[in-house]
From Swiss-Prot:
Record carries keyword Ribosomal protein: yes
Organism: Methanothrix thermoacetophila (strain DSM 6194 / JCM 14653 / NBRC 101360 / PT)
Family under the similarity heading: Belongs to the universal ribosomal protein uS15 family.
Family annotation (InterPro entries): Ribosomal_uS15 (IPR000589), Ribosomal_uS15_arc_euk (IPR023029), Ribosomal_uS15_N (IPR012606), uS15_NS1_RNA-bd_sf (IPR009068)
Name the UniProt record assigns to this protein: Small ribosomal subunit protein uS15
Gene that this sequence comes from: rps15
Taxonomy of the source species: Archaea, Methanobacteriati, Methanobacteriota, Stenosarchaea group, Methanomicrobia
Gene Ontology terms: biological process: translation
Length: 170
């Protein structure tokens, strides 16, 4: 399968081995793990950071084998899932950084004219293109999350309000 925004072929990556039981050295109980996940979530950690912390500091090799479900499913059951999915909010942050760069670092929240063709750094064609690619990825993800039902059907990405949406949902 090809890469999304280039003409390169993809390369196959490694997969974790198929494991159906926990190793004997893992002594974390399900209740202890649930409590730890909720405390890490209350500290404001994202799903990816929770997974890394559990792996590196608590020695949890496979969260799904202990809980019986994924981290997102566990947080959804506890009504603790953020309104905007993590991958979408990361892309929105990236688009905001690029747009702010193209606007010559104006203060936060003053993105007045969002048309890419009218940005002050008109010669920075590489970052303009990067912004276009990131925003197309955002639109693609929004379409997917609407189909799945993770985002409301009326939700839409607007660069003017992206900073407010990201900061209010953290």
């Amino acid at each position: 399968m090809a890469r999304m925004h280039s003409r390169k072929k993809g390369s196959s990556g490694s997969r974790p081995p198929v494991v159906d039981k926990l190793p004997e050295w893992c002594d974390v109980s399900k209740e202890e793990l649930e409590k730890t996940i909720m405390t890490l979530h209350e500290r404001g950690m994202s799903n990816a950071m929770i997974g890394l912390t559990l792996r590196d500091q608590y020695g949890v090799p496979n969260l799904k084998l202990i809980l019986g479900k994924s981290l997102s499913s566990f947080l959804r059951d506890r009504n603790a899932l953020p309104e905007i999915p993590e991958d979408l909010s990361n892309l929105m942050r990236k688009a905001l950084r690029l747009r702010r760069h193209l606007l010559r670092a104006q203060p936060r929240g003053t993105v007045s004219d969002t048309s890419i063709s009218r940005l002050p750094r008109t010669k920075d064609i590489h970052n303009k293109r990067a912004l276009q690619l990131v925003e197309s990825k955002i639109r693609r993800l929004v379409r997917y999350y609407k189909q799945v039902g993770r985002l409301p059907a009326t939700w839409e990405y607007r660069p003017e309000t992206a900073e407010i949406q990201i900061s209010s949902k953290q």
